[in-house]
């Protein structure tokens, strides 16, 4: 008798769930993506115990017809593709037909759904993938799917679940990414009756950024645009002063789908060039529209890995768009924000991307001229059971029955409010949508500005140049400023191979390990791009008989060794990066250092040269060359700006 048997469908679904349903966040992702594919404009996600006890997704999409409800729990049953040709032009987020049966096989699932054409809805209850009941339900256009007791029948999976806070953080991150991908949809995330995130769904991506990362972050984002025959690129990137220590704040979207792609991440960093500090990464939300035939999403069950045709062309488009956006405006960081930035960074990390413990209201401090959140404020939502009335319900009525929220005043109160404030659905929506920053006006101001006309005052600690203009006080780092000047000079020079060479009376010999000798022998032409000509000389040796005139004779051996190290350490060698690294190295080593006194004439000459640079705002390594104290900043420090705490609260436009 043969040993191979065909597994029953329930067991096959549990096996598939091992790939599709890694954790509660995977369930949230699949269900919300189904709601998006159904054309929903409002989606509510309720979770309890980080999704282990309950995940509930409610939408106002097209809904399922009665005969399709039971079929939806069958493996590879889908309405999104019909033949093999459709597999190569996928326009929906889901298409495999694996998610619902896989989720149902490891949970207790309830589906309540109805279409606009049907007179009543349908309710399905399944346990472990087996349908227990299928009955009619009061009509409400859209779908509500409840997933209870996740992994109840696969206890081994629970051993690998991290803390509830960690799992909830993953869920929050998923909703953040989907909100950024679809600003036209209103998303509401509720955990244990507390609202974590609410977006307005008005199509304004920057308002979504403000809801997720905070108003301060949204104000420091610059819009990017670009297109060619194959791609259309839109989105926002942060100013170089707004960075984080990892790539978690970079969101890349292909046709509305969040993906992970190392090469596109690298293209973003190349667009910033040397405006970023080493080891720092920007905020970026890039939305890329592409012909579906150029993207293969059928690579991994999570569909986060996508193979792209013409990937190099897309990288070039991204880098160019970011570089152009950042070249249009003044990139001088505000000094007070720079001083407070590191202290605020940990606080800002907790806004939506990491897990916020409570969603507190915004207040406006007229003295600080900034928004703040009262620590004492608490969040209250009364959750009632949905009405069982057989009459037809609208989506808004349905969600009100689920969350039972009350309207409150749209005004933002001052610090004298009571210590406990009730937050409602409407008030939180006002925070996102009614306070609208005049982002366009801000962008116009930045784009019309130029490098300031600086009047030199004095040198501070033989390191910084104090200057003033009508905009306020400026501090210039003399080393960083000269490094920027020399970097731009050497970058151009290194790109030009001059015939003018200085003959060495005593040639230099460079001895390498055998493996390094082989690599350098193959790549030595790259040194020719910088005017450095090495010849093979004996075993494992190169000889240098002449050097470019821009290279100081006292620094020849050290500089050539560093050039060799750059080539040997680069697995994927880029001539552009090589020239940058080499120019940065030469510029840094030859620039004036800290504690170097300068007379007034030299200081003014340095400032004049800095003003002529293509990018005068940062050195070759991304450190700022100049910081700014505005007149208001200085007056605030001396308490010369005083307003009562009971002044009328400002809107986002007033804040600008």
From Swiss-Prot:
GO terms for cellular component: mismatch repair complex. GO terms for biological process: mismatch repair. It comes from the Bacteria. Gene3D superfamilies: 3.30.230.10, Histidine kinase-like ATPase, C-terminal domain (3.30.565.10), MutL, C-terminal domain, dimerisation subdomain (3.30.1540.20), MutL, C-terminal domain, regulatory subdomain (3.30.1370.100). Keywords: DNA damage, DNA repair. GO terms for molecular function: ATP binding; ATP hydrolysis activity; ATP-dependent DNA damage sensor activity; mismatched DNA binding. This protein is involved in the repair of mismatches in DNA. It is required for dam-dependent methyl-directed DNA mismatch repair. May act as a 'molecular matchmaker', a protein that promotes the formation of a stable complex between two or more DNA-binding proteins in an ATP-dependent manner without itself being part of a final effector complex. Belongs to the DNA mismatch repair MutL/HexB family. This is DNA mismatch repair protein MutL. The lineage of its organism: Bacteria, Bacillati, Bacillota, Bacilli, Lactobacillales. The gene is mutL.
